[in-house]
Amino acid sequence: MAQGNNYGQTSNGVADESPNMLVYRKMEDVIARMQDEKNGIPIRTVKSFLSKIPSVFSGSDIVQWLIKNLTIEDPVEALHLGTLMAAHGYFFPISDHVLTLKDDGTFYRFQTPYFWPSNCWEPENTDYAVYLCKRTMQNKARLELADYEAESLARLQRAFARKWEFIFMQAEAQAKVDKKRDKIERKILDSQERAFWDVHRPVPGCVNTTEVDIKKSSRMRNPHKTRKSVYGLQNDIRSHSPTHTPTPETKPPTEDELHQQIKYWQIQLDRHRLKMSKVADSLLSYTEQYVEYDPFLVPPDPSNPWLSDDTTFWELEASKEPSQQRVKRWGFGMDEALKDPVGREQFLKFLESEFSSENLRFWLAVEDLKRRPIREVPSRVQEIWQEFLAPGAPSAINLDSKSYDKTTQNVKEPGRYTFEDAQEHIYKLMKSDSYPRFIRSSAYQELLQAKRKGKTLTSKRLTSLVQSY
């Protein structure tokens, strides 16, 4: 891989302003000490069957060096620190795409400074396409594409279909240059290039350490980035990014703006906030309330007829009678009763028995209006107005003056949300008055008790049937 004359250099001073640069510098100081000839990690060439593995060291060597030279007492801490450095690509396993450190005999190799993250690499997809394409031209077992790399290559080939010929030519030229290198040098450079892309295009499921925290990025003195091509590709084949203009100088806020800021922060201070303990208690109570309705946690009653021989579920559906769990759920809140068709029907029957069903019928009519085709909306708005809100309406509802005036204005330009304010007002009235009366009513209690009795009778019949056999 051609490294050119900018070996280990940064572009346009971006490196000094990168939010991660402090971390990079600390890691590179440790790497420099690791590579010291006298006190560093011993690098050796290992003889394998019919081949040699040059310039490697083991994972246990790294852990022992960190414990000895960085005054680390816990081996787990040393392993964690080494894994972080490996994830940033400063050293890498020679036979694995996952950049992690293992405290064993796994072989590792140092990355060349040209590929260090402190050089502020931001490689393009075209660079990655050249690299993958070049790998397919080299008939080496160690250079075969992994599954995720093959998928990436196919995706890039579709994305850059018009300029794929040029990308192929670039890859072919790079492959010819690599063939002219010494065998050992080529093996080392291939592994270092692979490790570079494992950092910038990591294995699915691995963390991308090159991503910049948005909070850190906002504190940069110069927020614009300069993209840098790995292979020196020309602008005509690179993806065009928007030109970043210098940030304009900020002006001191005016008196009006300061007043607006003060008003905003006063509103924020007056906002109602819940303590985390209250939120946790609320979440726990919600979970305990709905746990029996989660089939992953509690077996459903009645059981799924497709998984068992019990046909009770089908019998209940055929009889149109709700199960005990279904009836019990209506008591959790008015939303539960309204979103269940049978619950709405029972709620409406109860209100009709008390001659106060107009509120619920209005609420249901507005819900139906929201789902109507747009051509039917104006006529349906007039029907709802004449039935519930017009002077002398047959089913007049009780609205406050503010909601009525706003609805009157909305009717002049009918739409799906003409009655939004009126519906919200009626919903609050039902939630505070009609719904509690329905839950306390004998109709709901009888329905709930009937389900329990039915369940008891069914269990008794099953018991007697089993005993008879």
Swiss-Prot record:
Annotated DEP domain residues: 37-112
Modified residues (Phosphoserine): S229, S241, S434
G protein gamma domain residues: 255-316
GO cellular component, one term: dendrite
Stretches for region Disordered: 236-255
Location(s), subcellular: Cytoplasm, Cytosol; Cytoplasm; Cell membrane; Membrane
PTM note: Palmitoylated.
Descriptive protein name: Regulator of G-protein signaling 7
Taxonomic path: Eukaryota, Metazoa, Chordata, Craniata, Vertebrata
